[in-house]
Amino acid sequence: MSKDQIIEAIKEMTVLELNDLVKAIEEEFGVTAAAPVAVAGGAAAEGGAAEKTEFDVVLESAGGSKINVIKVVREITGLGLKEAKALVDGAPAPIKEGVAKEEAEEMKAKLEEAGASVELK
């Protein structure tokens, strides 16, 4: 299979399929797709005391009422039932990335009200 064929196959995948692919690659090769902490720390130090304006809403766990959390995830993301369930089952997982502070806090409140454990990054 050529590099171009692999890229074409990846283009046709859904977000959840890509997430599964990344996890499989991480397990197979013993690597991680996470950015090194030193790079993130350096970027934060350069920014000084500037307030963060964009946040990532990360679902840490669904808690006891998984069904309610799935409903809220569907409402927030617009995903289908299967995709929302896979996202909740795959926690910790980002729900939305690069959202304004106010919107991120609203999402966090909705998810926590449904019983989820959520972190803003």
From Swiss-Prot:
GO terms for biological process: translation. One of its GO terms (cellular component) is cytosolic large ribosomal subunit. Keywords: Ribonucleoprotein, Ribosomal protein. It comes from the Bacteria. GO terms for molecular function: mRNA binding; structural constituent of ribosome. InterPro entries: Ribosomal_bL12 (IPR000206), Ribosomal_bL12_C (IPR013823), Ribosomal_bL12_C/ClpS-like (IPR014719), Ribosomal_bL12_oligo (IPR008932), Ribosomal_bL12_oligo_N_sf (IPR036235). HAMAP family: Ribosomal_bL12. Forms part of the ribosomal stalk which helps the ribosome interact with GTP-bound translation factors. Is thus essential for accurate translation. PANTHER family: 39S RIBOSOMAL PROTEIN L12 (PTHR45987), LARGE RIBOSOMAL SUBUNIT PROTEIN BL12M (PTHR45987:SF4). Homodimer. Part of the ribosomal stalk of the 50S ribosomal subunit. Forms a multimeric L10(L12)X complex, where L10 forms an elongated spine to which 2 to 4 L12 dimers bind in a sequential fashion. Binds GTP-bound translation factors. Belongs to the bacterial ribosomal protein bL12 family. This is Large ribosomal subunit protein bL12. It comes from Halalkalibacterium halodurans (strain ATCC BAA-125 / DSM 18197 / FERM 7344 / JCM 9153 / C-125) (Bacillus halodurans). The gene is rplL.
